[in-house]
A protein has these predicted regions:
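Short acidic, flexible loop segments centered on an aromatic residue
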Residues: 64-84
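Low-complexity, acidic Ser/Thr/Pro/Gly-rich terminal tails and inter-domain linkers that flank the onset
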Residues: 21-54, 154-163
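Sec-dependent bacterial lipoprotein signal peptides
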Residues: 1-20
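Asparagine-centered strand-capping/turn motif at beta-strand->loop junctions
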Residues: 59-63
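Short, solvent-exposed, Trp/other aromatic-anchored flexible loops in extracytoplasmic proteins
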Residues: 88-144, 152-158
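Short coil-to-beta strand junction motifs in C2/discoidin
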Residues: 51, 68-73, 123-131
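Contiguous beta-strand segments within globular domains
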Residues: 47-58, 107-112
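A short beta-strand signature
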Residues: 53-57, 72-78, 132-134
């Protein structure tokens, strides 16, 4: 019985040690590549054109460990304001995780934006238009959300992807 308890204790200690050793800081373990920002048309809402801020990027695992259940949260803010203007959540890699050296394509857009009767291009040139920025956060497994990037939203229209 004592031998069984000793084996269980050793296995538990090894598992705890392994879990501690494999904790990867998202700031150093993930790399944002090919970041593209802009304003995406989400169609006509209540008779007006609607534009929302959007960000797309490749999220690369630069660590030497598989990162399970990799998630991304984008928080959009208008320049000069501290409060959240909108947010978007995406799963970059499911339970299989993101292998070392692998990358996932991520594209998210805010649910909030601007509406107007002007054309989409004219809306971006409007003197009352306020620029936006996005903070990108990531987490994997049971780790905490960590900010991995901040980007200005370019004042450009993002064309819809071809079918």
């Amino acid at each position: 019985m004592k031998k069984l308890i000793a084996i269980c204790a050793l296995a538990l200690a090894s598992a705890a040690s392994f879990a501690c050793e494999t904790a990867i800081d998202p700031v150093t373990g993930l790399q944002l590549e090919s970041v593209s920002t802009g304003w995406r048309s989400v169609g006509v809402v209540d008779g007006m054109n609607k534009l929302v801020p959007s960000v797309s990027f490749r999220l690369k695992n630069v660590s030497d460990h598989r990162l399970p259940s990799l998630q991304v949260n984008a928080v959009f803010r208008r320049v000069g304001e501290k409060g959240e203007w909108g947010s978007a959540f995406a799963t970059a890699a499911g339970t299989d995780g993101l292998a070392p050296g692998a990358a996932a394509e991520v594209s998210v857009k805010s649910q909030l934006g601007y509406t107007g009767t002007d054309s989409r291009a004219e809306m971006l040139r409007n003197s009352y238009f306020v620029d936006a920025k996005v903070d990108v956060y990531a987490k994997y497994g049971s780790t905490q959300w960590t900010r991995i990037g901040e980007y200005a939203i370019d004042r450009q229209l993002i064309e819809p992807a071809s079918p």
